[in-house]
Curated annotation (Swiss-Prot):
This is UvrABC system protein C. The gene is uvrC. Pfam families: GIY-YIG (PF01541), UVR (PF02151), UvrC_RNaseH (PF22920), UvrC_RNaseH_dom (PF08459). GO terms for molecular function: DNA binding; excinuclease ABC activity. GO terms for biological process: nucleotide-excision repair; SOS response.
């Protein structure tokens, strides 16, 4: 029993962070406070604020505190602890992806392209965009409006005549001299810059001036080109919501919460334009109040989830934040510019955007609730079928190869909410007879389970995509494991496809019963098994294809003396892949940077006689 009175006697009235541990020495909650003594004392009153707090306090074994210089420092430390430990009773945002940007490169003839990751490439970055699809859509639009290049620098350097993009009017062909001047290209680059900054009006004004100048000089062909550009830009403007207010960089957040599931929807506005939107479904402990959810989400989203995320000038949210001022100060320091947080009195076009975010949040939550209902029905059906009290984690294995070559095994994981893609794994299978699926499965299982596993990582069910032979090999492999965790816990099930290999005709081979089960095609349990089996199959095939493609592109070059990884990469890049290398002339191979005349002859002769 935790002695709260003795513990609180030594806690100071200072700002800091506290970490609550259970009997297994696992951190179950992380919090911060302006006054540690006051905050921690509130957990041990006779009447607690919520059932969530009651459950938390009942599991406390001991508490550790860290004193900080300020509330701001405590806020940062709190989110670092949450990210590192993923405590059970904290709201957890499960999203660690970098966000894509549009990059205008620093070059004599800049290119526009998508970019993801640390901003190490020289140039101007616009974004972030919520997903790769939004970037592709914008790049396609830019290519139609402004004819500047999107090709790789290696492709650009090796052109001797304009490519198809020039012929269809989507590039000025700066790679070849004599088609357009540097000034004309720079002008189009500047228009792209203005457009991405949301200054559409300036783009139109500039093009109108250019059109009028061309007409006065009787260059009617150029005037017609500018006229077409003006019409295209105006057509884009008409499709967009045009605000009378000055809307710079905003993130607009709305939270919908129902039946223990939360949806946080964000509209990303940059330079007055909505770049896109995204819905998040954080893991929320039961009976969490909305203020805590809003506080934790905003803190995690901007402070801990991704170092490349751009922090906007203003964050608008439809739920009150208890720590808005402290959070705004921290974000301002992180961003290098003033960041404000508004959670009330939102008016004008910002109010309209917030209403749009709310509509999207509610719609996404409704859809998620329906999906969760289907998932629960399927899990309940499978639990009843197998006579299991609970199913918290399932894993499924599949093997993929082409005639025994480039064999890959996949392992996919489902938890109570469906696919847990962050835990998916692939295994390269080596040292076996080609086409021996039993040996491949054994190797995959040994790689996956022949090591220490935390209790929560031990699956309740392991599905093996295959018949009785595969299942028996899997059982033998498990029997041979020498591990500290309970290897008897997982129930192994073989999923045989049947003679016609059609969905709905699967046979289940249940290891603990040593019998076969045929489920009706409309069985929710069967649908869940088909889902995890298909996920595993697709994951294996994707991995196998990547491995096969890599072997194909590298074959023929690895064996040549003097051709290492860098030269091999240069040959493939400059000559357009392995097919381009094989069909290249001696002179073309010699023109690749880093390839001498002597080495080019060796490469050419080797490929011609291979």
């Amino acid at each position: 029993m935790f002695d709260a009175k003795a513990f609180l006697a030594d806690v100071p009235h200072l700002p800091g962070v506290y970490r609550m541990y259970d009997a297994k020495n696992t951190i179950i909650y992380v919090g911060k406070a302006k006054d540690l003594k006051k905050r921690l004392s509130s957990y041990f009153r006779s009447q607690l604020a919520s059932k969530k707090t009651e459950a938390l306090v009942a599991n406390i074994h001991h508490i550790e505190t860290t004193i900080t210089h300020s509330e701001t420092e405590a806020l940062l430390l709190e989110h670092n602890y949450i990210k590192e430990n993923q405590p059970k009773y904290n709201v957890l945002l499960r999203d660690d992806k970098s966000y894509p940007y549009i990059l205008l490169t620093k070059h004599q003839h800049p290119r526009i392209t998508s970019f993801r990751g640390s901003k190490k490439v020289a140039g101007e970055y616009f974004g972030p965009y919520p997903n790769a699809g939004a970037v592709r859509e914008t790049l396609n639009l830019l290519q139609k409006l402004f004819p500047i290049r999107q090709c790789e620098d290696s492709y650009y350097k090796n052109r001797s005549r304009p490519c198809l993009q020039y012929q269809i009017g989507r590039c000025l062909a700066p790679c070849v001299e004599g088609y357009y001047s540097q000034a004309e290209y720079d002008n189009q680059v500047n228009l792209v810059r203005l457009f991405l900054q949301g200054k559409d009006g300036q783009v139109v004004e500039h093009l109108v001036q250019k059109m009028e100048n061309a007409a006065q000089e009787l260059d009617f062909e150029a005037a017609a080109r500018f006229r077409d550009q003006i019409q295209s830009v105006r057509a884009v403007q008409e499709k967009q919501f045009v605000s009378n207010e000055r809307l710079d960089d905003l993130d607009i957040i709305s939270i919908a919460y129902q039946h223990g599931i939360a949806c946080v929807h964000i509209l990303f506005v940059r330079h007055g334009k909505v770049l896109g939107n995204r819905s998040y479904f954080p893991k929320v402990p039961n009976n969490t109040d909305l203020t805590e959810l809003a506080d934790t989400f905003v803190g995690q989203f901007y402070l801990q989830m991704n170092q490349h995320r751009t922090i906007p000038n203003q964050i608008i949210i439809d739920q009150p934040l208890s720590e808005a001022t402290a959070l705004a100060n921290v974000l301002s320091e992180q961003a290098g510019h003033k960041v404000s947080i508004a959670d009330k009195n939102i008016r004008g076009d910002k109010s309209r955007y917030l209403a749009l975010a709310k509509t999207n949040a509610e719609a996404a939550l409704t859809l998620q609730l329906k999906q969760d209902t289907h998932i629960r029905q399927r899990y309940d059906s499978l639990k009843a079928l197998l006579n299991l009290a609970e199913i918290k984690r399932m894993e499924c294995f599949d093997i993929s190869h082409t005639m025994g070559n480039q064999t890959v095994a996949s392992c996919v994981v489902f938890d109570e909410n469906g696919p847990l893609k962050s835990d998916y794994r692939r295994f390269n299978i080596e040292g076996i007879t080609g086409g021996d699926d039993y040996a491949a499965m054994e190797q995959a299982l040994l790689k996956r389970y022949g090591r220490h596993l935390e209790e929560e990582k031990i699956p309740d069910i392991i599905f093996i995509d295959g018949g009785k032979g595969q299942l028996n090999r899997a059982l033998e492999t498990f029997a041979s494991l020498n591990v500290s965790w309970d290897k008897r816990k997982p129930l192994l099930i073989g999923v045989a496809k049947g003679v016609e290999r059609k969905a709905g005709l699967e046979t289940l081979l249940i290891s603990k019963w040593d019998k076969e089960i045929h489920l009706p095609p409309d069985s929710p349990a069967l649908h869940l098994i088909q889902h995890i089996r298909d996920e595993s199959h697709n994951h294996a095939i994707t991995g196998h294809r990547k491995k096969r493609q890599k072997a194909f592109t590298e074959s023929g070059l690895e064996s040549i003396a003097g051709v290492g990884a860098k030269r091999r990469q240069a040959l493939l890049k400059y000559l357009g892949g392995m097919q381009g290398v094989k069909s290249a002339t001696l002179e073309e191979i010699q023109s690749v940077p880093g390839i001498s005349k002597q080495l080019a002859e060796v490469i050419f002769d080797t490929l011609q006689h291979s």
